[in-house]
UniProtKB/Swiss-Prot annotation:
Species the sequence originates in: Vesicomyosocius okutanii subsp. Calyptogena okutanii (strain HA)
Catalytic activity entry: L-glutamyl-tRNA(Gln) + L-glutamine + ATP + H2O = L-glutaminyl-tRNA(Gln) + L-glutamate + ADP + phosphate + H(+)
Originating gene: gatA
UniProt name for this protein: Glutamyl-tRNA(Gln) amidotransferase subunit A
Family designation: Belongs to the amidase family. GatA subfamily.
Coiled-coil region list: none
Residues passing through the membrane, by range: none
Length: 480
């Protein structure tokens, strides 16, 4: 059953081939036997209660397509009464007193939450090695990273531990692990899904999204996650369409842009070949391919890491050992409490970004770093606007390589390069997807789809049509 999509599980539940309780027990058994370390918290008792409620709803004929579907929730979304750690020692004992808007919407649809997934601490990382709860393993090769920061969510879907999972994408944290684990990942337009109740890393970048087996599943889940929320000041009052309506539209005449900057040195040859084979598949469906340019995307890494680190420095200042979270037992006075609690509670990468952000915001450096980075951010956004006057969608790689070995990248700057193709999308606030398009070195390769603002329907349509013609999204890791 772990290979089934949302649509297939819905049919099975509707036909009474199995119950929600049986389905939930099946997934919980797989989680308990798994060696992926994909979960921080397994909510088995809660899941079985939710499954029984879903069974009762189905019996009364009041079920939707999502009723009783088991999912994994990234441990950055607040869940009332359930530990919400953000992968950090700082929040290891934090029990959220309220639900994030996304959590609330999923609960209202009578979905079954199997647990909270492992992640890079406060979503800062590209390998899921920065977690206080140890690294997640890639289901395709246990010696490889799953990607980050939503590595636990990606591994849970690829490894058959959940039907789908939630994620967040600040600089590629849905698309990159989706690519490295061979699943479908969607990061919507900034403001499309409420950020209320998501533990903040960089507020002008953070965006909730979805990790699924198929584009059709992603459309189904986006239907209930998207929408305006008065609790989130960055939430957009943009009408939410039915994202499943246009999935079967023809791609005849679709204009695809390939940014020349995405295919320079540094991109693995096998990865590039897989990307181009996928593009040729789209051409066979009637699409037209054009070379385009995003000249300022080469500045995406320094621009992102300056702005995001500044926002991180501000957001994480609330974690001081006083109100909630980790509190040092060795402190002698209030100042010492602040210093020791944060030094002991935060991991090395988080402390590095806090220091970078604090430095960039300090007197004498604000204009030289933060203000300049914001100006470059605008130039990057303008590049995309110009390109979208000529094309319908931009395509390219998600990651320059396939998944690398656990523990093999020690240099932070080298790690930051893993996000070279995804960061510009977050800087511009655009929607993006990753869909599986092949393998290199026996590891999955993802194709990145980048759309104009609010074009999630188009991206899902493009991905769905590709998945009707290919079977890369149906491939399953041998050990799973």
């Amino acid at each position: 059953m772990h290979t089934k999509t949302i649509v297939e599980l819905y049919k099975g539940l509707k036909n009474k081939d199995f119950s929600c309780v049986e389905l939930t027990q099946y997934y919980l058994s797989r989680i308990n036997q798994s060696k992926l370390n994909a979960f921080i918290t397994v909510t088995d008792e809660l899941a079985l209660v939710q499954a029984q409620v879903a069974d009762d709803k189905i019996a009364l004929g009041n079920a939707s397509i999502l009723t009783g579907i088991p999912y994994a929730h990234k441990d950055i979304f607040c869940t009332k009464g359930v530990k919400t750690s953000a992968g950090s020692k700082m929040l290891d004992t934090f029990i959220a007193p309220y639900d994030a808007t996304v959590s609330q919407k999923l609960n209202q649809m009578n979905l079954v939450m199997l647990g909270k997934t492992n992640m890079d601490e406060f979503a800062m990382g590209s390998s899921n090695e920065n977690s206080f709860y140890n690294a997640v393993k890639n289901p395709w090769n246990y010696l490889k990273i799953p990607g980050g920061s939503s590595g636990g969510s990606a591994a849970s879907v690829a490894g058959g531990l959940s039907c789908f999972a939630t994620g967040t994408d600040t600089g590629g944290s849905i698309r990159q692990p989706a690519s490295l684990c061979g699943i479908t990942g969607l990061k919507p337009t900034y403001g499309r899904i409420s950020r209320y109740g998501i533990i903040a890393y960089a507020s002008s970048f953070d965006q909730a999204g979805i990790m699924t087996k198929t584009s059709q599943d992603a459309a189904i889940v986006l239907n209930i996650m998207a929408g305006f929320d008065e609790k989130d000041s960055t939430s957009a009052e943009q009408k939410v369409p039915d994202y499943t309506t246009n999935l079967n539209n023809s791609l005849q005449g679709l204009i695809i842009g390939l940014p020349k900057e995405f295919f320079l040195s540094g991109l693995d040859n096998e990865v590039a070949n897989n990307i181009m084979f996928a593009v040729k598949e789209f051409e066979s469906m009637g699409a037209i391919v054009k070379e385009v340019s995003l000249p300022n995307s080469v500045y995406a890494i320094p621009t992102y890491y300056i702005i995001a680190s500044c926002e991180c420095s501000s957001n994480l200042s609330r974690l001081d050992g006083v109100r909630y979270g980790y509190r040092s037992k060795e402190s002698k006075n209030l100042e010492d409490l602040y210093l020791s609690s944060r030094s002991e509670g935060f991991g090395e990468e988080v402390k590095r970004r806090i220091m970078i952000g604090t430095y960039a915001l300090s007197t004498g450096y604000y204009d030289a770093y933060y203000l300049k980075a914001q100006k470059v951010r605008r130039l990057i956004s303008n590049d995309f606007k110009k390109v979208f006057e000529k094309v319908d969608v931009i395509m390219g790689p998600v990651s320059p390589t396939t998944a690398f070995d656990l523990g093999s990248v020690k240099d932070p700057v080298s790690m930051y390069l893993a996000d070279i193709y995804t960061l510009s999308v977050n800087l511009a606030g655009l929607p993006g997807m990753s869909i599986p398009v092949g393998f290199a070195q026996d590891l999955p390769v993802g194709l990145q789809l980048i759309g104009n603002y609010w074009s999630e329907s188009k991206l899902l349509n493009i991905a769905h049509q590709f998945q009707l013609q290919t079977d890369w999204h149906l491939r399953i890791p041998q050990e799973c």
